């Protein structure tokens, strides 16, 4: 499979008018293979394996929010990057998930060919189903290189998507609290 991939990269280089045998490009097919192997590693990861070992009994029934989770992904339409921040909240239902697992969940879905709308939905649904939460809220803000580098060429434009489940969808006060928290000034200084 690796050789086939590398041969395709060589063909692309030739089609755009490059010489894949020149010094700067000789190792490019292998580098591109390794890059895509990493960038698409989410296909080989199982959400249940990540979350189920990190569920802990808890009486907490208040919102848990992990915000400003930086991510990058590849647009499934152009194979160009999009990147930004995800804000993920849930309300526990007798169990909490280890905090590091929420960014890992974002990473699993971001490391697949994606569109932002689908990424947002997948994160919300996976957390809702695997943690048995009372509700989940996910907001993603991202910049898309397919918008900035080609076509319309609108640099620095941002796309925002949201996905709400359970009490976040049904209860206006929960929804307001979520949006207020993700929009509040950052209090932690590093």
UniProtKB/Swiss-Prot annotation:
UniProt GO MF annotations: GTP binding; GTP cyclohydrolase I activity; zinc ion binding
Annotated InterPro entries: GTP-CH-I_C/QueF (IPR043133), GTP-CH-I_N (IPR043134), GTP_CycHdrlase_I (IPR001474), GTP_CycHdrlase_I_CS (IPR018234), GTP_CycHdrlase_I_dom (IPR020602)
This protein's record includes keyword Transmembrane: no
GO CC terms: cytoplasm
Superkingdom classification of source: Bacteria
Catalytic activity: GTP + H2O = 7,8-dihydroneopterin 3'-triphosphate + formate + H(+)
Gene Ontology BP term (one): tetrahydrofolate biosynthetic process
E.C. code: 3.5.4.16
Binding site for Zn(2+): 75, 78, 146
Database matches in PROSITE patterns: GTP_CYCLOHYDROL_1_1
One Pfam family this sequence matches: GTP_cyclohydroI
Pathway: Cofactor biosynthesis; 7,8-dihydroneopterin triphosphate biosynthesis; 7,8-dihydroneopterin triphosphate from GTP: step 1/1
Keywords, sorted A to Z: GTP-binding, Hydrolase, Metal-binding, Nucleotide-binding, One-carbon metabolism, Zinc
Subunit structure: Toroid-shaped homodecamer, composed of two pentamers of five dimers.
Family: Belongs to the GTP cyclohydrolase I family.
Protein name per its UniProtKB record: GTP cyclohydrolase 1
